[in-house]
Amino acid sequence: MSQGVEFNRLMLEMRSMQMEAMAKAKPVQAPAEVGAPSFSEMLSQAVDKVNETQQASTAMANAFEVGQSGVDLTDVMIASQKASVSFQAMTQVRNKLVQAYQDIMQMPV
């Protein structure tokens, strides 16, 4: 007899938990952030940053080649490697975006 009462109590608890869970399952919308940059703006900023890095590296290399004082070979090499790494990273991001686009376009409708 006590097991039947225990079972009924457990069933009541489970039902109340189910009702609570269903009440909490309302879809929540994320608040729209004012002034948050769009994906295209962020991508454009990243490309601009890579471009600036490459231009700074080229300018530093040109300054070293003409013998401008204050330009050290190690600084030129570090700037060159930073530009190279940033360009390679941007290329990989582009490749991933192209692959994602192709995957989406090949999905059956």
Curated annotation (Swiss-Prot):
Keywords: Bacterial flagellum. GO terms for molecular function: cytoskeletal motor activity; structural molecule activity. One of its GO terms (biological process) is bacterial-type flagellum assembly. Pfam families: FliE. The keyword Secreted does not apply. Belongs to the FliE family. HAMAP family: FliE. This is Flagellar hook-basal body complex protein FliE. It comes from Pseudomonas aeruginosa (strain ATCC 15692 / DSM 22644 / CIP 104116 / JCM 14847 / LMG 12228 / 1C / PRS 101 / PAO1). The lineage of its organism: Bacteria, Pseudomonadati, Pseudomonadota, Gammaproteobacteria, Pseudomonadales.
